[in-house]
Amino acid sequence: MKTKILNLANEEIGEISLNEDIFAVEFIRDDIIKQVVDWQRAKAMAGTHKTKTVSEVSGTTKKPFKQKGTGNARQGSLRSVQMRGGGVIHGPVVRSHATKLPKKVRKLGLIHALSEKFSEGKLLVIDSLKLETPKTSNLVNILNKFQGKSFFVIDGNEVDVNFSLAAQNIYNTVVVPQIGANVYDIIRHEYVLLSQEAVNVLEERLK
């Protein structure tokens, strides 16, 4: 399967053959894509939420008032869960939200996400993702030629330093080497831009 190669001016300069088993899967498995996205988002959660239990709340352990004769319900501690400023029962604790997902499923998710973008006509192959200077304004002008609202840019094994620096302050634009290609960023950005080197490395990695 062939597709056109563009330059950074959005001009066609040639053709490249793409592996249909990676970029043109016939039946897109949205369920697999969702599984991988859920796995990614769970793994990214900090898990630093925490409330204090009765034993952790600061305060006295003295009985607030005598057992009998006050007309109030008996109380043993001001740190009890029913007291204002007391502990929290069954509250969140610091933990990892990460789950396990087989490598084959993760690989399938990436293949189906790339195929979905290609079927929409929003996966573009660029001859080279290199800039002479790290000027954000220059890169903004380049991306405007593709008429997209958001871009996920995937380069080869290494990202051009000037391109990476220029993209840092551009809203909804993420630049990664091929090892950083992931399902969540592919589906949440409107366009995916792949360098020729990225295509070759991804085909080798996902075959």
UniProtKB/Swiss-Prot annotation:
Region entry Disordered, spans: 53-76
InterPro entries: Ribosomal_uL4 (IPR002136), Ribosomal_uL4-like (IPR013005), Ribosomal_uL4_dom_sf (IPR023574)
GO cellular component: ribonucleoprotein complex; ribosome
GO biological process: translation
Molecular function via GO: rRNA binding; structural constituent of ribosome
Keywords: Ribonucleoprotein, Ribosomal protein, RNA-binding, rRNA-binding
Endpoints of the signal sequence: none
Gene3D superfamilies: 3.40.1370.10
Keyword Lyase on entry: no
Subunit structure: Part of the 50S ribosomal subunit.
Family: Belongs to the universal ribosomal protein uL4 family.
NCBIfam families in the cross-refs: rplD_bact
Function: One of the primary rRNA binding proteins, this protein initially binds near the 5'-end of the 23S rRNA. It is important during the early stages of 50S assembly. It makes multiple contacts with different domains of the 23S rRNA in the assembled 50S subunit and ribosome. Forms part of the polypeptide exit tunnel.
Protein name: Large ribosomal subunit protein uL4
Gene: rplD
